[in-house]
Curated annotation (Swiss-Prot):
Top-level class of the enzyme under EC nomenclature: oxidoreductase
SUPFAM superfamilies reported for this sequence: Glyceraldehyde-3-phosphate dehydrogenase-like, C-terminal domain, NAD(P)-binding Rossmann-fold domains
GO MF, one annotated term: NADP+ binding
PANTHER family: N-ACETYL-GAMMA-GLUTAMYL-PHOSPHATE REDUCTASE, CHLOROPLASTIC-RELATED, N-ACETYL-GAMMA-GLUTAMYL-PHOSPHATE REDUCTASE, CHLOROPLASTIC-RELATED-RELATED
Active-site residues from the entry: C155
Protein name: N-acetyl-gamma-glutamyl-phosphate reductase
Pathway where this protein functions: Amino-acid biosynthesis; L-arginine biosynthesis; N(2)-acetyl-L-ornithine from L-glutamate: step 3/4
Higher taxonomy: Bacteria, Bacillati, Cyanobacteriota, Cyanophyceae, Acaryochloridales
EC code(s) of this entry: 1.2.1.38
Organism: Acaryochloris marina (strain MBIC 11017)
Pfam family, one: Semialdhyde_dh
Domain of life: Bacteria
Length: 352
């Protein structure tokens, strides 16, 4: 059993969308209290100035980032920072005894050469990075439960890998045949002003970006290779959709056994995720919509087999800011502290 005492928690990078989602979740978590909100760009401002709707729940100010203060006040630290910054802070925090959950890409890779190639940043923390656990609980639950440093997955990899995992682990597909076509809402681009995220630009339009070179590609391939026990290459194309939040990933792959039918795969997926409360395998010809996951930590999976082409099609729907970011980070926190992984996380969406 885990500790039932309130744990002091800090968020560095609290002013962005990931930070405010974390703040909302942690304010309602029964076994933590927020002891520190850090962010240099908003330092000195009451958090309620940035997000007035949370003003009645807390009276914290955003402070300039000071790792000495963080270590003094907290036991657990969430890093919700741009790529490259967590690697400058995590070594000090971990060395001083804090548990760290990083929401950037800095600690997602087992091979830092891959990180350096795709993110263009040289790393000086290879020893620490080698101890990080990839924070996808459905696949790495045991490692997360004993970790001091967790690299929380990206939103696209979360949706894609939950769709692919049973297929790769059970050897049901040609692993290099996987094609991932994914759509995301505009909140995935962050809170900074960007032309393509303006209402006039994004509304009523959908289009691809990062074609053939999106940074989430090697992350998906790394975990897929681990699951398959061999090197896996995937084709991944993301699209920006005219919605605020949500990811819909449609995964196509060639089956090794063309005799398998949809009901077989639903049985296999249901068994694979039988101990995963945040993954819902849908029955029959039911396919998910992003609205179903809105504001929750759930991942919905719909499955189909095209006997004509010999392909399996898996549709995965999540909320990019919840299961794709802050919610999954809290799920990892629960595992690290020995608490039920559903604790403090919303399960039911608002509808319509």
């Amino acid at each position: 059993m885990g500790s039932q005492e309130d744990i002091p928690v800090g968020i560095i990078g609290a002013s962005g969308y990931g930070g405010v989602q974390l703040t909302r979740l942690l304010l309602e978590h029964p076994h933590v209290h927020l002891a520190y909100l850090g962010g240099d760009s908003s330092a000195g401002r009451p958090f309620a100035d940035l997000y007035p709707h949370l003003g009645f729940k807390q009276d914290l100010k955003v402070e300039a980032i000071d790792l000495d203060k963080v270590v003094e006040r907290t036991q657990v630290v969430f890093l919700a920072l741009p790529n490259g910054l967590a690697a400058e802070m995590a070594p000090t925090l971990v060395e001083c005894g804090c548990k760290v959950l990083d929401l950037s890409a800095d600690y997602r890779f087992t091979n830092l050469d891959t990180y350096e190639d795709w993110y263009g940043t040289k790393r000086q923390d290879r020893d620490l990075a080698s101890t990080a656990v990839y924070g996808l609980p459905e696949l790495y639950r045991q490692g997360i439960s004993t970790a001091s440093l967790v690299g929380c997955p990206g939103c696209f990899p979360t949706a894609s890998l939950l769709a692919l995992a049973p297929l790769l682990k059970q050897g049901l597909i040609d692993p290099n045949s996987a094609i991932i076509d994914a759509k995301t809402g505009t909140s995935g681009g962050g809170r900074q002003a960007k032309t393509h995220l303006l209402l006039a630009e994004a509304n009523g339009s959908i289009g691809p970006y990062g074609v053939a070179h999106h940074r989430h590609t090697p992350e998906i391939e790394q975990v897929s290779s681990d699951l398959a026990g061999r090197e896996v290459v995937v084709q991944f194309t993301p699209h920006l959709a005219p919605m605020t939040r949500g990811i819909l990933a449609t995964v196509y792959a060639t089956m090794r056994d063309p005799g398998l039918v949809r009901e077989d795969l639903i049985t296999i997926f249901s068994a694979f995720y039988r101990n995963s409360p945040w993954v819902k395998v849908l029955p029959g010809s039911t396919y998910p919509f992003t609205k179903w996951a809105y504001g929750t930590n759930l991942c919905y999976l719909g499955i189909e087999v095209d006997q004509r082409t010999g392909r399996v099609i898996v549709i995965s729907a999540i909320d990019n800011l919840m299961k794709g970011q802050a919610g999954q980070a809290v799920q990892c926190l629960n595992l690290m502290m020995g608490w039920p992984e559903t604790m403090g996380l919303p399960e039911l969406t608002f509808y319509p």
